UniProtKB/Swiss-Prot annotation:
SUPFAM superfamilies with a match to the protein in the record: Acid phosphatase/Vanadium-dependent haloperoxidase
Residues annotated as the enzyme's active site: 212, 254
Major localization listed first in the record, in broad terms: endoplasmic reticulum
High-level lineage: Eukaryota, Metazoa, Chordata, Craniata, Vertebrata
Protein name per the record: Polyisoprenoid diphosphate/phosphate phosphohydrolase PLPP6
CDD domains per the UniProt record, alphabetical: PAP2_containing_2_like
Composition-biased stretches (Low complexity): 10-25
Length: 293
């Protein structure tokens, strides 16, 4: 009697695919019992009752064959999702404003370095550096504050005191606004600058905007509007303001944009002072207290 331990095809485990043994199902031998056993095996394979048959059908399925390769199973987990079209457009096409600002900054740094011919004693115009530093002192806030206070104390006319008091107000406003903007922006001074400036404060380590440029524009506009000067003197005042701003770049103290914005800020500061002009009519208490000194 044949052993009931058979494969799915009904062959004995020890038989080869090309040989047949008498009495086996291939030769029709073995009686009806072996035929019924083979028929029941086939039925169990079709119904999925046998776990071995279930594994065989799963291994023959197309899904299992596709997943049997490790690369095919790993690919869906490794491939990152493609970015949305709008995100890719933002990365590849930066805004026009950003490109313009970066280009302006690059030109500003390049031009400031080219114009810094007096930044050190070994620079191209290093011999002119003492003269530039003297011009630097002429635009410093301390000499202007002390000079305005001295003239205010020596003045004996109401009109002169009114002009000088508003000049003092303008200088204090300039110092306050420049200090606030420098503290907010915190732009470092150029790398080729030497920190040998006259009477510096904590905010003076920052360069934007140029306090000398704001003061030069403010004082020049103030003088031209409230002092009667001959034409050569008026030209000299404008020339002083321009050369003072240029000297800030030549000494390496500031970049070109620091000075340009400083001129604009100083020009607008005078508009504020002119709008808030102090006079005996709007602030009589201030002038009365000053006259009692």
């Amino acid at each position: 009697m044949p052993s009931p331990r058979r494969t799915i095809e009904g062959r004995p485990l020890g038989s080869s695919g090309g040989s047949s043994v008498p009495g086996s199902p291939a030769h029709g031998g073995g009686g009806g019992g072996s035929g019924r056993f083979e028929f029941q095996s086939l039925l169990s394979c079709r119904s999925g009752a046998d776990p071995a048959c279930a594994r065989l059908r799963a291994s023959d399925s197309p899904v299992h064959r596709r997943g049997s390769f490790p690369l095919a199973a790993a690919c869906p987990a490794q491939v990152a999702p493609a970015p949305p079209p709008e995100d890719a457009g933002m990365n590849l096409n930066p805004s026009f404003l950003g490109i313009a600002l970066r280009s302006l900054l690059a030109i500003d740094l390049w031009l400031s370095k080219k114009l810094g011919v007096c930044a050190g004693e070994s620079s191209a115009w290093g011999s002119v550096r003492p003269l530039m530093k003297l011009l630097e002192i002429s635009g410093h806030g301390i000499p202007w504050l002390l000079g305005t206070l001295y003239c205010l104390l020596r003045s004996d006319s109401w009109a002169g005191r009114e002009v000088l008091m508003n000049l003092l107000f303008a200088l204090l406003l300039d110092l306050l606004l420049v200090a606030v903007i420098k503290g907010l922006v915190r732009r470092r001074r150029p790398a080729h600058n030497q920190m040998d400036m006259f009477f510096t404060l904590s905010v003076d380590k920052y360069s934007f905007p140029s306090g000398h440029a704001t003061r030069a524009a403010l004082v020049s506009r103030f003088i031209l509007n409230h002092l009667v000067l001959a034409i050569p003197l008026r030209v000299l005042v404008v020339l002083w303001a321009f050369v003072l701003g240029l000297s800030r770049v030549m000494l390496g103290r500031h970049n070109v944009t620091d000075v340009a914005f400083g001129f604009f800020l100083g020009y607008m500061q005078y508009s504020i002072v002119d709008y808030c002009w102090l006079s005996p009519l709007n602030v009589p208490v201030l002038f009365v207290l000053w006259n009692q000194q």
